[in-house]
Each structure stands twice: as structure tokens, then as C-alpha cells.
């Protein structure tokens, strides 16, 4: 048994300069596990609650001293003496201690910091890398990166309504080469923007944030960048889009202000389908708003057999909501964000449910990140086969990519890279 003897939390800053929670879990052996939690900009209404102080005199009300205090008092007292290797029991203890459906009393940010720190401490105690500790002997597969190279929506101060346009190196032979493909496309896009006199400033997730005449202009630019990098669109590098549709869904219509459009769910499905006909798009995330389940059904029936349809705000990493979606044949993939649900155990539950239903899983960062690399290990440990962790700039994003490079090196000849196969539904 590796008993927990202390838990210490602190307020640190994320990549947007906002406070977040970091926790240390100390074991009787002297081992320490440390983890920091991320924070989102566009959030689903049913996400677990991120506890903020609300004190406008500190960090514009975004301080997390209450969550930190909950870790240092109630949570610490509840888990001291527990075996750090019993992740499920530790997480369940914290869930019951909180006592709410959405973790609003203690804060999902408090619970998650401790949950991840416990896993790190347990891995360190076992003398194993985190991906191996969490996944056992099986993990050998690196995820396909979905790299957000044009930012819009809540992630950037520009005129693009859609939140992310991503490049996906489906034709690369390895993760290392996939990262190279992405980096070279990123730099090619920068040159294209620069030559056109457009801004090359970046958004929250490291992608460029230019003002463009239309969303299709973003797709055309990405195709040009892929070709400029000496790669083939659709063969070497495919495209993914995160619409984040909940952000522009009002009064039953999708308001695409940059193009002066107001579309019904059926019309918006036609809009997205036209993109898929013209461009090598293989993944669409949040193609409908989280509350528009009828729209999701229209979209799934229309595109679900040819495109990965990812539910982010739709499912919020919640197995109960995912179960309903599976029963109604809504979407075919789930985005996995650990802070949407608040513990690693519940995260594993959602991933396993998706696998059993033939849904794909995409491990994801948030727009407000830290140097914590847990999600890189999680992607390998769970054999998720896909990861979203931003563009090819900003060290908070590169930390995850670099960790995956290390894991690939450690796995050596046993490492594999699924490429396009990662986007085929299982079952």
C-alpha cells in the first residue's frame, strides 16, 4: 500500500493569465505527484462546475482560492491514509464528499487536480511512466494529432464564427512525421498570410487568427498551405473543423454573422455537407448546438457514414449523456476533456462506453492550458488514437506534443501510428 499523507493545492496561472488549481499529493514513501487543471473558453452548459471566487478585486473574479482551500482542507482530510493506487475509490470518495451532481460545491477544478495528482504519484511510486501505469502493458499506439492552425470564435478576436480549422496528418508513417507535417503546413500558412498582408498573430490555442472574407476562405488557405508544404490534401493531410455551434445558435437558428447567414438545422447541415464535398474534411466537431438534438440527428443521418461527427458541448465527457446519444444514434465520436467531468475515473468510463458503442474518442486540451502533459499520456494509455492539443506554437501546446515524441521514442519499434484508421468507427 502506498498511503497518501498530505495534499497541498495552490493557485497558479494558465496560458491565458487566468488562475487555475495545481495540486501536490505526497505519499509516505516521499514520492510527490503534481498536476494542474485546464480551463475552457467555450463551455458546454452541462459541464462539471469550475469553481471561481467571484471576487472582482482579484483576477476579475476568476480567482480559485476557494477551490484551493477545499483541496487543502476537506479533500485532504478525506483522502489522507487512502491507497494512492486505488484511483476509483479516491475519485468516488471525492465525488461523494462534494455531494452534488455537477461538483459545484467543492469545484471540479479542485477534484480534478487531486485526481490527476494521485495518478501521477501512483505512477511515480510504481516506477512507471504515466501512460504505462494507467494503461497497463497494452498501450503501443500514438494518437493522430488534430492541429488547430486557424482560430476563430471564442478563441480569437477576429471575424470567424467557427472556432477551429485543423490539419490532420492522416498519411504520416509515424507520430514524429505527423508532427513534422503539421509544423511545415503551419509555417507554409504563415508565409501565405504574410504574403497576403494578413495578420499572423495567434489565438488562444496557437493558431493564426486572421480576418477572412468567409469560412470557405479559411479552408482554401489550408489547402494551399498543405500544397505549399509539398504535401497532398486529403492524402497526406486532411482537414477537421470545430464549429462550436452552441456559440452562434440563437432562437432556433445558426447565426453566421461573418457571412450574414441565419440557417435552420437542415440548412446548416447542407452548408457543412457542401464543405465536405469540396474539401478533404474528415472530422466535424459540434456541428450542431448542444441543445439541438433534432439538428444533430439530421446531421448524423446526412454525414455520419462519411465524416467523424464529434460531440464536445453535446456530451461534455459525461457517460450518462453519451449513453443517451448512443441510444438516439447521435454523432459518432466523443471529445474527451478531463475537466468537463472532474475525475480520471469518470473520464475512463466515458472512453470505455464510447469504445463499446463503436464511437471514436478524441482526447482534448482546453483553450486555457498549463505545462501539465497528463492528456498526452492519457491518449496513449486509453488507445484513444486521436488528440487535440492546439497548433504548432505556444509552449503550453508544444508540451503535450513533445511528451508524445518522448513516449514514441520510449516505445521504440513497438510504437504504431494509426493514421486514417483512427477515424474509422469501431465495432
From Swiss-Prot:
<feature type="binding site">
    <location>
        <position position="163"/>
    </location>
    <ligand>
        <name>(2R)-2-phosphoglycerate</name>
    </ligand>
</feature>
<comment type="pathway">
    <text>Carbohydrate degradation; glycolysis; pyruvate from D-glyceraldehyde 3-phosphate: step 4/5.</text>
</comment>
<dbReference type="GO" id="GO:0005576">
    <property type="term" value="C:extracellular region"/>
</dbReference>
<dbReference type="Pfam" id="PF00113">
    <property type="entry name" value="Enolase_C"/>
</dbReference>
<feature type="active site" description="Proton donor">
    <location>
        <position position="205"/>
    </location>
</feature>
<keyword id="KW-0963">Cytoplasm</keyword>
<dbReference type="InterPro" id="IPR020811">
    <property type="entry name" value="Enolase_N"/>
</dbReference>
<keyword id="KW-0324">Glycolysis</keyword>
<dbReference type="GO" id="GO:0000015">
    <property type="term" value="C:phosphopyruvate hydratase complex"/>
</dbReference>
<feature type="binding site">
    <location>
        <position position="312"/>
    </location>
    <ligand>
        <name>Mg(2+)</name>
    </ligand>
</feature>
<feature type="binding site">
    <location>
        <position position="366"/>
    </location>
    <ligand>
        <name>(2R)-2-phosphoglycerate</name>
    </ligand>
</feature>
<dbReference type="GO" id="GO:0006096">
    <property type="term" value="P:glycolytic process"/>
</dbReference>
<keyword id="KW-0964">Secreted</keyword>
<dbReference type="InterPro" id="IPR029017">
    <property type="entry name" value="Enolase-like_N"/>
</dbReference>
<feature type="active site" description="Proton acceptor">
    <location>
        <position position="337"/>
    </location>
</feature>
<dbReference type="GO" id="GO:0004634">
    <property type="term" value="F:phosphopyruvate hydratase activity"/>
</dbReference>
<feature type="binding site">
    <location>
        <position position="388"/>
    </location>
    <ligand>
        <name>(2R)-2-phosphoglycerate</name>
    </ligand>
</feature>
<dbReference type="InterPro" id="IPR020810">
    <property type="entry name" value="Enolase_C"/>
</dbReference>
<feature type="binding site">
    <location>
        <position position="242"/>
    </location>
    <ligand>
        <name>Mg(2+)</name>
    </ligand>
</feature>
<feature type="binding site">
    <location>
        <position position="337"/>
    </location>
    <ligand>
        <name>(2R)-2-phosphoglycerate</name>
    </ligand>
</feature>
<dbReference type="InterPro" id="IPR020809">
    <property type="entry name" value="Enolase_CS"/>
</dbReference>
<dbReference type="InterPro" id="IPR036849">
    <property type="entry name" value="Enolase-like_C_sf"/>
</dbReference>
<feature type="binding site">
    <location>
        <position position="367"/>
    </location>
    <ligand>
        <name>(2R)-2-phosphoglycerate</name>
    </ligand>
</feature>
<dbReference type="Pfam" id="PF03952">
    <property type="entry name" value="Enolase_N"/>
</dbReference>
<protein>
    <recommendedName>
        <fullName>Enolase</fullName>
        <ecNumber>4.2.1.11</ecNumber>
    </recommendedName>
</protein>
<dbReference type="InterPro" id="IPR000941">
    <property type="entry name" value="Enolase"/>
</dbReference>
<comment type="function">
    <text>Catalyzes the reversible conversion of 2-phosphoglycerate (2-PG) into phosphoenolpyruvate (PEP). It is essential for the degradation of carbohydrates via glycolysis.</text>
</comment>
<dbReference type="GO" id="GO:0009986">
    <property type="term" value="C:cell surface"/>
</dbReference>
<feature type="binding site">
    <location>
        <position position="285"/>
    </location>
    <ligand>
        <name>Mg(2+)</name>
    </ligand>
</feature>
<keyword id="KW-0479">Metal-binding</keyword>
<keyword id="KW-0456">Lyase</keyword>
<comment type="similarity">
    <text>Belongs to the enolase family.</text>
</comment>
<keyword id="KW-0460">Magnesium</keyword>
<dbReference type="GO" id="GO:0000287">
    <property type="term" value="F:magnesium ion binding"/>
</dbReference>
Amino acid at each position: 500500500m502506498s498511503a497518501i499523507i498530505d495534499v497541498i493545492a495552490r493557485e497558479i496561472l494558465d496560458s491565458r493569465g487566468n488562475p487555475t488549481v495545481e495540486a501536490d499529493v505526497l505519499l509516505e514513501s516521499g514520492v510527490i505527484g503534481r498536476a494542474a487543471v485546464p480551463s475552457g473558453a467555450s463551455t458546454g452548459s452541462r459541464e462539471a462546475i469550475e469553481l471561481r471566487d467571484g471576487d472582482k478585486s482579484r483576477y476579475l473574479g476568476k480567482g480559485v482560492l476557494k477551490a484551493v482551500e477545499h483541496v487543502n482542507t476537506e479533500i485532504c482530510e478525506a483522502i489522507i491514509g487512502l491507497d494512492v493506487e486505488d484511483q476509483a475509490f479516491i475519485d468516488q470518495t471525492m465525488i461523494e464528499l462534494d455531494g452534488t451532481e455537477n461538483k459545484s460545491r467543492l469545484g471540479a477544478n479542485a477534484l480534478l487536480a487531486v485526481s490527476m495528482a494521485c495518478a501521477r504519484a501512483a505512477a511515480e511510486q510504481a516506477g512507471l511512466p504515466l501512460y504505462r501505469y494507467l494503461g497497463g502493458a497494452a498501450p503501443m499506439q500514438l494518437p493522430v494529432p488534430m492541429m488547430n492552425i486557424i482560430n476563430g470564435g471564442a478563441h480569437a478576436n477576429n471575424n470567424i464564427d467557427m472556432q477551429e480549422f485543423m490539419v490532420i496528418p492522416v498519411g504520416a508513417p509515424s507520430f514524429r512525421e505527423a508532427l513534422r507535417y503539421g509544423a511545415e503546413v503551419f509555417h507554409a500558412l504563415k508565409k501565405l498570410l504574410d504574403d497576403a498582408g494578413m495578420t499572423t498573430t495567434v489565438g488562444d490555442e496557437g493558431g493564426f487568427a486572421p480576418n477572412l472574407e468567409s469560412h470557405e476562405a479559411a479552408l482554401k488557405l489550408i489547402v494551399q498551405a498543405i500544397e505549399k508544404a509539398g504535401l497532398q490534401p486529403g492524402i497526406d493531410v486532411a482537414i477537421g473543423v470545430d464549429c462550436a455551434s452552441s456559440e452562434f445558435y440563437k432562437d432556433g437558428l445558426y447565426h453566421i454573422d461573418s457571412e450574414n447567414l441565419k440557417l435552420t438545422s437542415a440548412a446548416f447541415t447542407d452548408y457543412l455537407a457542401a464543405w465536405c464535398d469540396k474539401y478533404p474534411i474528415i472530422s466535424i466537431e459540434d456541428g450542431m448546438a448542444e441543445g439541438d438534438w433534432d439538428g444533430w440527428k439530421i446531421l448524423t443521418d446526412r454525414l455520419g457514414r462519411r465524416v467523424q461527427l464529434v460531440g464536445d458541448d453535446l456530451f461534455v465527457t459525461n457517460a450518462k449523456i453519451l449513453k443517451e446519444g448512443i441510444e438516439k444514434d447521435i454523432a459518432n465520436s466523443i471529445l474527451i476533456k478531463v475537466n468537463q467531468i472532474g475525475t480520471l475515473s469518470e473520464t475512463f468510463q466515458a472512453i470505455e462506453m464510447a469504445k463499446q458503442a463503436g464511437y471514436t474518442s478524441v482526447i482534448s486540451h482546453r483553450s486555457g492550458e498549463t505545462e501539465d502533459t497528463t492528456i498526452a499520456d492519457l491518449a496513449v494509455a486509453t488507445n484513444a488514437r486521436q488528440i487535440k492539443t492546439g497548433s504548432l506554437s505556444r509552449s503550453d501546446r508544444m508540451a503535450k506534443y513533445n511528451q508524445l515524441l518522448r513516449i514514441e521514442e520510449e516505445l521504440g519499434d513497438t510504437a504504431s501510428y494509426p493514421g486514417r484508421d483512427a477515424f474509422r468507427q469501431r465495432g
